[in-house]
A protein has these predicted regions:
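Bacterial N-terminal signal peptides
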Residues: 13-22
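Acidic, polar-rich low-complexity tracts and alpha-helical solenoid repeat scaffolds
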Residues: 2-7, 21-281
Length: 281
């Protein structure tokens, strides 16, 4: 009897073991492999992951469509959506890769301007601290310009123009930061060269009034009263309501150069004639 009880117990466990194996195999067989799904089904899964907030999984599934069904009608859209999903996840390098492949494969597509815009944004969104290298800013500017020049009537041309202005402001801020450092440490010519870049290359940015004021400071420190006077005249003409105007006026209050500004030579004379007199030749 004891033997029979042991035998029954062992038989029960063996039976249970095989049942578990059978259930596991059945479960595995019911799981559909990705390769068994159509492009449309994979796209639906990817879109659901995207909508649910799992952009990483969504990007993987979108790229699976490109891998499994490269010639399907959804491959093109999936490739672009992978760039969008990766951008959301701040995986900018991978996002650029997907967008660049889209441009290579579909250069004349209606969504190609958007692919360029994603590339530009991937650079632009990495612009942060003014103390860092500005290579990213220049890459963003280059791609935004491509959009404006090649696709001026696209919906991305106007936001690209706005982003260019903001990028210019960022570059001007970088020049101002370096220029102030040189000015503070009495490296006047080095400071002048930095402020000159702001006035000549980024004249529409918010930093131009201060750049002109700092030029007045630097030129007066070097005893170059003519240059200081012209810098002040440009500031007074264009930015009289600026917070820098009164400080500049006070600096130049006791300066009497007897200068005929209209005949002044050099880069400041050119700027003066262009800005105030409207002579662009």
């Amino acid at each position: 009897m004891a033997f029979l009880r042991v035998f029954k117990k062992q038989t029960f466990w063996i039976f249970g073991f095989f049942v578990c194996i059978l259930i596991g195999c059945t479960s595995s067989n019911t799981e559909t492999k990705l390769e068994d799904l159509s492009a449309k089904e994979i796209y639906a899964k990817a879109q659901k992951e995207f909508d649910d907030g799992d952009k990483v999984k969504a990007a993987e599934l979108f790229l699976d469509i490109e891998r499994l069904y490269p010639y399907s009608g959804l491959a093109k859209r999936a490739l672009l959506m992978s760039a969008v999903a990766l951008h959301h996840e701040k995986d900018y390098e991978s996002s650029r890769g997907s967008a660049a492949r889209f441009i290579t494969f579909y250069p004349a597509d209606a969504d190609t301007p958007y692919a360029y815009y994603l590339i530009a944004l991937s650079h632009y969104d990495q612009i942060d601290e003014i103390g860092r290298d500005q290579a990213t800013t220049y890459e963003a500017l280059k791609t935004f310009r491509i959009i404006i020049e090649r696709y001026p009537n696209s919906e991305y041309a106007k936001p690209s123009s706005m982003k260019i202005e903001l990028a210019f402001d960022h570059l001007a801020a970088k020049e101002m930061e370096i220029g102030r450092y040189y000015l503070k440490n009495s490296h006047y010519m080095a400071a002048i060269n930095r402020f000159k870049i702001v006035v000549e290359e980024y004249p529409t940015t918010s930093h131009t009034p201060e750049a002109l004021h700092r030029l007045v400071e630097a030129y007066l420190s070097l005893g170059l009263t003519n240059e200081a006077t012209i810098s002040g005249a440009i500031l007074g003409h264009n930015f009289k309501s600026s917070v820098w105007y009164q400080d500049t006026y006070d600096l130049l209050g006791g300066v009497d150069t007897g200068l005929n500004i209209n005949n002044f030579k050099g880069w400041l004379g050119d700027v003066y004639r262009q800005v105030i007199r409207g002579d662009w030749i």
